[in-house]
Amino acid sequence: WKTGDVLLLNGKIYTGRDAAHKRMVDMLNKGEKLPVDFTDKIIYYVGPVDPVRDEVVGPAGPTTATRMDKFTRQMLEQTGLLGMIGKSERGEAACQAIADNKAVYLMAVGGSAYLVAKAIKEAKVVAFPELGMEAIYEFEVKDMPVTVAVDSSGLSVHAVAPKQWQAKIGIKILDRKSVV
């Protein structure tokens, strides 16, 4: 996968936000076994809302990935994690950790929590239920739309896309003072 590629994910992914990451890193630091095997898996930075009626989960939009940057290298190196899904750009250290571990960071579209939830076909809590919506869930997804935001070489769409878009549409980015 290359930066900017649009993918439809299918299969099992796990969830985890700030509280779950903190707990997992604390466990790793103590030499404890994690309750989930993340080898070659993807973790989605999300805290799903409770389902209503026939929903599997309620709205399940991505959370800001930069909050997990401080956990990224350790999670990749000690768990065998393949990749992460979130929204927003990643910091330089996280991009380097992704490159060093030949991992990937995918972006789900922020603001589309309801649409993302429709791709989730099954959901169950697999660890840390006391964390509520920040518990670790296992999702079975079908055709979950994501964009490769940082590829396995560490190249970030946030670094390259603005220049590519400018070249394609042939305009310069204007400030408010120059807009007529």
Which ranges hold each PLM region?
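Short, charged beta-turn/beta-strand-edge "cap" motif at the junction between a beta-strand
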Residues: V6, K12-G16, S152
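Conserved small/polar residues in nucleotide/adenosyl-binding loops
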Residues: V179-V180
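C-terminal binding/interaction regions
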Residues: K118-R176
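Pocket-edge structural micro-motifs
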Residues: G11, V46-P48, V150
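Feature captures the catalytic cores and cofactor-binding loops of soluble hydro-lyases/lyases
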Residues: T15-M144
